[in-house]
C-alpha cells in the first residue's frame, strides 16, 4: 500500500485581512481530502515563519503556505541547502500577489484559490538572487513601485488605471534618477527592474517569459518627460517588448548580471531590503518545485 504524503500548511493569520484564518477549516478540509492528514502551523512572527519553513523542509513532502509576495520571499530565503525539498504550494493571501498570476492561482477568492492550487501540477520555478538575498520574482530600484503597490484595490476597481495617477504623482514629488552600472555599462535611469516574472506590481509586463530556464531580464527605463514617468507608465501599460521597440527602455538578458550603484534600498519581492554593491544578480543556480497552472 502506497504511503500517504506528509503535508503541512503554514500561514500568517493576519495577512489578507484574515481571509485565510476565516476559511481555515475549509482549506485544511480540502487539502486533507486530497492528501490525507494535514498539519498546521499558525505563524506568530517573521522569525517563526522562517524557522517553521526551514524545519518543515526536512520532514514533509508537500509544504503549503499562504501570504503575499513578501511571504513567498521569506519562504525561499528560509529553504535549507538540502538535496531533497518538498513540493511547495502557494495560496495567495497578502496585499501584493504577483506570484498568484505567475502560478495561475486565484488571488481574489480564497476558495477559488484552494481549488486552483489543488488542481495544479508540479513545475520547476527558478530562484533568483541579488547579492546575499534570494528573490522569487523581482528586484527593482525606483521611487514609483511602492506607489503602485499601495494603491487601494477599491480605487483600482472603481477607476481602473486612473487610480494609480494620484499615488504616482505623490511619488513623483520625491522621485529621482539613479546612476547604475549593469554589466559595466553606465545608465542614468528612474527605474531598474531585474526579474524572471510575467507580472510586476500587478501589471503583466512579460507574459511569455519562462521561469524555469535560468534566464532573467533587466529593464532599464530611459530618462524622459516627467523624470521618466511617461516611459515607466508605457512599460507597465504595454509591456517589455513594446517599451523596448518604442525605445523607452533598454533590456539586458542573461543568467548572471553584474550591477553597481550607490543606491542601497531596493524593492525585493514587494519588500524593501538594504543591499550592498557591487553585486552579482540573476539565477541562483537553484530551483524549487511549486504547484502551478501555467504551462
Where are these regions (language model features)?
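Gly/Ser/Thr-rich active-site loops/lids in small-molecule metabolic enzymes
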Residues: 155-162, 206-228
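Short amphipathic alpha-helical segments
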Residues: 21-23, 76-79, 101-103, 205-206
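ATP/nucleoside-binding phosphotransfer catalytic cores, i.e., glycine-rich phosphate-binding loops
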Residues: 210, 220-295
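Short Gly/Thr/Asp-enriched flexible loops that form oxyanion-binding sites at enzyme active sites
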Residues: 71-83
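Short hydrophobic-aromatic micro-motifs
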Residues: 133-140, 145-146, 187-195, 200-202, ...
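Catalytic core of DAGKc-family lipid kinases
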Residues: 43, 81-193
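ATP/NTP phosphate-donor binding region
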Residues: 1-66, 73, 186
Amino acid at each position: 500500500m502506497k504511503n500517504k504524503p506528509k503535508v503541512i500548511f503554514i500561514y500568517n493569520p493576519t495577512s489578507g485581512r484574515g481571509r485565510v484564518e476565516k476559511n481555515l477549516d475549509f482549506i485544511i478540509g480540502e487539502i486533507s481530502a486530497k492528501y490525507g492528514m494535514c498539519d498546521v502551523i499558525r505563524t506568530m512572527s517573521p522569525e517563526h515563519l522562517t524557522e517553521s519553513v526551514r524545519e518543515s523542509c526536512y520532514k514533509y513532502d508537500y509544504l503549503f503556505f499562504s501570504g503575499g509576495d513578501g511571504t513567498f520571499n521569506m519562504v525561499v530565503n528560509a529553504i535549507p541547502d538540502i538535496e531533497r525539498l518538498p513540493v511547495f504550494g502557494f495560496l495567495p493571501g497578502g496585499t501584493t500577489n504577483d506570484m498568484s498570476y505567475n502560478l495561475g492561482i486565484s488571488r481574489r477568492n480564497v476558495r477559488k484559490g484552494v481549488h486552483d492550487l489543488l488542481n495544479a501540477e508540479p513545475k520547476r520555478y527558478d530562484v533568483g538572487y541579488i547579492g546575499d538575498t534570494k528573490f522569487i520574482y523581482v528586484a527593482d530600484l525606483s521611487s514609483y513601485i511602492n506607489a503602485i503597490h499601495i494603491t487601494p484595490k477599491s480605487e483600482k476597481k472603481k477607476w481602473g488605471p486612473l487610480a494609480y495617477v494620484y499615488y504616482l504623482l505623490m511619488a513623483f514629488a520625491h522621485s529621482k534618477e539613479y546612476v547604475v552600472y549593469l554589466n559595466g555599462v553606465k545608465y542614468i535611469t528612474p527605474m531598474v527592474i531585474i526579474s524572471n516574472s510575467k507580472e510586476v506590481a500587478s501589471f503583466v509586463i512579460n507574459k511569455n517569459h519562462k521561469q524555469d530556464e535560468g534566464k532573467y531580464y533587466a529593464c532599464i527605463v530611459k530618462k524622459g518627460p516627467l523624470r521618466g514617468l511617461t516611459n515607466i507608465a508605457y512599460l507597465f501599460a504595454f509591456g517589455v517588448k513594446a517599451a523596448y521597440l518604442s525605445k523607452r527602455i533598454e533590456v539586458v538578458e542573461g543568467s548572471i548580471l553584474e550591477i553597481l550603484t550607490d543606491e542601497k534600498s531596493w524593492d525585493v519581492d514587494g519588500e524593501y531590503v538594504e543591499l550592498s554593491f557591487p553585486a552579482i544578480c540573476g539565477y541562483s543556480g537553484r530551483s524549487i518545485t511549486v504547484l502551478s497552472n501555467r504551462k
